[in-house]
């Protein structure tokens, strides 16, 4: 038995990190990110982030006037995973990670595992509790278990939530309004599923969502995460499946995002010949890195499990 495995038997809390570094943590979002907790009778938020090259990290946000160093994180594994519990932080508080690079520079990063984010042009992460939504799609879920998904009929309507219909020249429908508009149209036209162009958080409208910065956050352009859950729930109650585009091929170079997350390549391939998509000006994931594998697998399963998405188009 390897020493790491012996340690895990003594302290099961090390298991998420162990699996993460093996590329086998399929629910890394349950550990990393910002999670509401109560410790020693005090409610607050525990923050965890992976940053293998960082010299130091602090959590900054509305709760400390965005002052670097006010809430320094500590390494929980002696290596690359950082953690901090901050009492008093609450849902919807905006935050970022202030990373001190090995070269001494300060960079401000959104949380790769954030469940919610500010609406562009702002780009901070938001504390959010994704639990507690009351689903009403039991009948749909039961029917899908019996359905012949390979040979059964399927007619898919692809659409972009931000431009399909607008309330005026610039304002799109929110998630709830979108469902109310879509359902009668899809039924009338005989579609079985709606396929959404990417709804994971992204900064640039012109990308149509194909330059993702938030792999665990539905875009706040149209509402909150639970608003998006309600969208899926309404579709299922109407007998309509929901497929979403999931974009693991590349990610943008926005300074607050995954690119050079701790001042050096973390999520992207460090070899520029493999790590950059020259045509798009975006970065390519380091698919051979275990931590990146855990990140991407967790993202894919997150949408299926937490949002009841019926399928992903890659």
Whereabouts are the PLM-identified features?
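Substrate-binding/active-site clefts of carbohydrate-active enzymes
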Residues: 141-151, 160-311
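Structural beta-strand segments of beta-rich domains
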Residues: 43-48
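Short beta-strand elements bearing conserved aromatic residues within extracellular beta-rich modules
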Residues: 57-59, 95
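The feature marks proteins involved in alpha-glucan
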Residues: 1-42, 74-158, 163-170, 177
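Short proline/glycine-enriched turn/loop motifs at strand-loop junctions of beta-rich domains
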Residues: 50-57
């Amino acid at each position: 038995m390897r020493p790491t495995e012996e340690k895990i038997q003594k302290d099961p809390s090390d298991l998420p990190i162990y699996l993460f570094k093996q590329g086998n943590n399929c629910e890394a979002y349950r550990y990393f990110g910002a999670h509401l907790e109560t410790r020693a009778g005090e409610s607050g938020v525990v923050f965890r982030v992976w940053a293998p090259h960082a010299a130091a990290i602090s959590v900054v946000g509305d709760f400390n006037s965005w002052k670097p160093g006010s809430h320094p994180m500590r390494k929980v594994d002696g290596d690359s995973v950082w953690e901090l519990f901050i009492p008093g932080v609450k849902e919807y508080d905006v935050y970022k990670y202030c990373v001190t690079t090995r070269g001494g520079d300060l960079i401000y990063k959104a949380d790769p595992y954030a469940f919610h984010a500010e609406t562009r042009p702002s780009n901070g992460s938001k504390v959010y509790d994704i639990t507690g939504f009351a689903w009403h799609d039991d009948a749909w879920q039961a029917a899908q278990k019996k359905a012949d998904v390979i040979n059964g009929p399927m007619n898919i309507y692809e659409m972009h939530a931000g431009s399909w219909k607008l309330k005026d020249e610039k304002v799109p429908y929110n998630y709830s309004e979108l469902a109310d508009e879509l359902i009668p149209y899809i039924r009338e036209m005989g579609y079985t599923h709606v396929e959404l162009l990417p709804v994971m958080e992204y900064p640039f409208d012109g990308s149509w969502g194909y330059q993702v910065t938030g792999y665990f956050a539905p875009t706040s352009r149209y509402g909150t995460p639970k608003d998006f859950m309600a969208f899926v729930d309404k579709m299922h109650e109407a007998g309509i499946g929901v497929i979403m585009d999931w974009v693991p091929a590349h990610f943008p170079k926005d300074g607050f995002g995954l690119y050079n997350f701790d001042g050096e390549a973390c999520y992207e391939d460090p070899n520029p010949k493999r790590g950059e998509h020259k045509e798009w000006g975006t970065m390519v994931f380091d698919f051979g890195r275990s931590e990146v594998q855990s990140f991407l697998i967790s993202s894919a399963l997150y949408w299926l499990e937490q949002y009841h998405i019926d399928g992903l188009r890659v």
